Design a protein with these regions (language model features):
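Short, surface-exposed loop/helix-turn segments at secondary-structure junctions
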Residues: 117-123
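Bacterial N-terminal signal peptides
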Residues: 5-14
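A generic structural micro-feature
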Residues: 83-86, 123-129
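Short beta-strand edge/turn micro-motifs at domain boundaries
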Residues: 101-105, 128-160
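A solvent-exposed, acidic/Ser-Thr-rich amphipathic alpha-helical stretch
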Residues: 46-112
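Short, low-complexity N-terminal intrinsically disordered segments enriched in polar/charged residues
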Residues: 17-47, 51-55
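Short beta-strand segments enriched in hydrophobic/aromatic residues
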Residues: 41, 53, 108-110, 150-153
Length: 160
């Protein structure tokens, strides 16, 4: 009798876990991470960006890969002395075919302008680039983290 009750309790727990995962909105949770990345990157918040990745997460851009949170953090912090950036995220497509995993593609338009002490808006001639982020996500305990991100450039602005 005790074995039967334990079996029923275990079955109820497993069904509850399965239902919880099926009702989890991967698109909403992982889209939020995509937007958070853009904002934190523009603020040169290296720790904030690094925390959006798994411990062993990777970010690849222009043939260079940064692996692990520390490397990702240092890449962002290195931009503190560079130009001002704005990453504008538009189209986001997130799909999950396996519990705990998701894939996504998002479009990004990047504007770059010179850093200045002025409070006036920065003048730019056009976007610096338009591309796609190809992401693999891991979802654990309701939190979506980037396992890998690759930037694929599509258009660049050419000064004439």
């Amino acid at each position: 009798m005790l074995l039967r009750l334990l079996s029923i309790a275990l079955l109820g727990f497993l069904v509850g876990c399965q239902q919880q995962d099926q009702s989890f909105d991967y698109s909403e949770a992982c889209s939020s991470v995509v937007h958070d990345y853009a904002y934190l990157r523009d603020q040169t918040d290296g720790q904030g960006v690094a925390n959006l990745f798994t411990d062993e997460g990777s970010f690849s851009i222009f043939g260079e890969t940064f692996s692990g949170r520390q490397a990702i953090k240092q890449r962002v912090l290195g931009a503190e002395v560079g130009p001002v950036t704005r990453h504008l995220i538009s189209t986001i497509d997130i799909e999950s075919k396996t519990p705990g995993k998701a894939r996504g593609v998002s479009y990004v338009t990047v504007y770059i302008g010179p850093r200045s002490d002025s409070t006036n808006p920065i003048e730019v001639e056009g976007f610096a680039g338009i591309g796609e982020y190809h992401d693999r996500f891991v979802v654990d305990a309701g939190e979506c983290l980037i396992e890998s991100r690759e930037f694929i450039p599509v258009f660049t602005y050419q000064d004439k």
